[in-house]
């Protein structure tokens, strides 16, 4: 019963559950005198105007959802910053919507910088006491809304990100440093709103949903501003010598000073409207209805992707699965087979010296498969790891899937080499003609990654 079809369908249910257009549409209601957005009410007057600003992997679909619910007479402007790869999915957005693109391969570029300048200009132009700025924020927003602090240039900021990623930095660590190298992140975008108010509807792509770190928190005034000691601790924990960093980056971080941010925080509201938990619940409901004893183990899976892959192999090869590393602290009760174990979160990859092409999900599944070369499964199993954005690393694959039928030793002899070279994408492209790749195309959203492990008796 542990079939690939069930796992693939469960992953599709995840994507449907976090579809951005419907989520935003459900968060907004309007009557002649009152606008309700999430849990916040706005009394409307004849002078009330709304400016919609969307950025992130879900920006186009989120903007569609907002425009579905808002009267055109209220809308003063809609501006969207979307990933370059999403060109062509903007159908149904009205002609008065301005769409800008950038961040190819999820890295900031000059198009991102230009688009950010445009957003700042629009905020300044439309700011008034009767203006509501509706921000629609999703994963990938950090690369799309980018404005390096002087004297930094974009190349120096990119080099810093590259160094941190090569040292296995988490999204939390990356975004903390990004905030300190930016003129818009960490609540600094709100400095441009002098008179109006703002509300942000946010799709979380960060473990634990810390609103101040999602897309690097451009609309969130930090409760406690970071000091240079926090920054230094991050670099030390990643074993990054400051001398590795570009000189301007090193100087900006070392001379970090307290930012001047707006003091009247009641004008600025932030609400998380979707997260990894939404996706996991949808998968669990589907698998339960399909006859599986389904359990959401965690939505906070983190760590090195290759090491986590080995731990999934441990579950697959242990008869008593609750003693395995990933499950021993979960208070899990396994009563009846078949079993569906669901995980969510975001892992990291330590790149080899001359890395190939891949992503954390493809690497996790490859590591699991590689570990199973020398171990015998204790269950019939199917294991999937995939990113909800449809793009695992700089590749066109969301992830990969394996099951018992993939284990003949003669077809796996070179798996270790691909793993050591951080080249998981090319392994899965070649292995069985690419049949194990999960190829969804860009989903238009991002709520981190999903792992599904189905187990049945042999």
Curated annotation (Swiss-Prot):
Which terms in the Gene Ontology molecular function aspect does this entry carry? Answer: glycerate kinase activity
Name assigned to this protein: Uncharacterized protein C13B9.2
What InterPro entries does the record tag this protein with? GK-like_C_sf, GK_N_sf, MOFRL, MOFRL_assoc_dom, MOFRL_protein
- Which family, according to UniProt? Belongs to the glycerate kinase type-2 family.
Pfam families found in the cross-reference section: DUF4147, MOFRL
GO cellular component labels: cytoplasm
């Amino acid at each position: 019963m542990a079939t690939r079809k069930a796992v693939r369908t469960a992953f599709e249910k995840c994507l449907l559950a976090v579809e951005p257009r419907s989520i935003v549409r459900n968060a907004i209601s309007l009557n002649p005198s009152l606008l309700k957005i999430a849990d916040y009410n706005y009394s409307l007057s004849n002078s009330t105007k709304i400016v919609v600003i969307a950025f992130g992997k879900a920006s186009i679909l989120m903007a569609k959802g907002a425009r579905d619910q808002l009267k055109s007479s209220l809308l003063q402007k809609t501006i969207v910053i979307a990933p370059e790869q999403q060109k062509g999915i903007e159908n149904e957005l009205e002609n008065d919507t301005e769409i800008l693109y950038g961040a190819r391969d999820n890295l900031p570029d000059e198009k991102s910088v230009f688009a950010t300048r445009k957003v700042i200009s629009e905020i300044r132009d439309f700011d008034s006491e009767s203006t509501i700025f509706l921000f629609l924020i999703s994963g990938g927003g950090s690369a799309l809304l980018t404005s390096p602090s002087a004297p930094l240039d974009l190349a120096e900021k990119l080099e810093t990100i590259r160094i941190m990623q090569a040292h296995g930095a988490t999204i939390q660590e990356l975004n903390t440093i990004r905030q300190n190298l930016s003129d818009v992140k960490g609540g600094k975008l709100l400095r441009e709103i002098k008179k109006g108010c703002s509300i942000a509807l946010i799709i979380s792509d960060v473990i634990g949903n810390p609103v101040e770190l999602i897309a690097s928190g451009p609309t969130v005034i930090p409760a406690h501003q970071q000091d240079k000691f926090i920054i230094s601790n991050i670099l030390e924990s990643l074993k990054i010598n400051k001398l590795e960093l570009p000189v301007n980056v090193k100087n900006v971080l070392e001379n970090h000073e307290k930012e001047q941010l707006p003091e009247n925080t009641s004008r600025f509201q932030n609400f998380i409207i979707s997260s990894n938990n939404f996706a996991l619940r949808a998968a669990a409901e589907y698998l339960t209805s399909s006859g599986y004893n389904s359990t959401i183990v965690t939505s906070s899976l983190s760590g090195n992707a290759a090491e986590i892959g080995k731990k999934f192999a441990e579950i697959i090869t242990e008869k008593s699965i609750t003693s395995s590393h990933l499950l021993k602290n979960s208070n899990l009760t396994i009563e009846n087979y078949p079993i569906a174990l669901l995980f969510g979160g975001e892992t990291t990859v330590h790149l080899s010296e001359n890395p190939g092409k891949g992503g954390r999900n493809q690497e996790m599944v490859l590591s699991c498969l590689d570990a199973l070369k020398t171990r015998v499964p204790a269950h019939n199993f199917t294991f999937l790891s995939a990113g909800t954005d449809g793009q695992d690393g700089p590749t066109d694959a969301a992830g990969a899937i394996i099951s018992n039928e993939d284990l003949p030793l003669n077809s796996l002899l070179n798996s270790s080499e691909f793993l050591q070279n951080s080249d998981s994408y090319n392994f899965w492209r070649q292995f069985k003609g690419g049949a194990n790749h999960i190829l969804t195309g860009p989903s238009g959203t991002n709520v981190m990654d999903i792992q599904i492990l189905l187990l049945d008796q042999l």
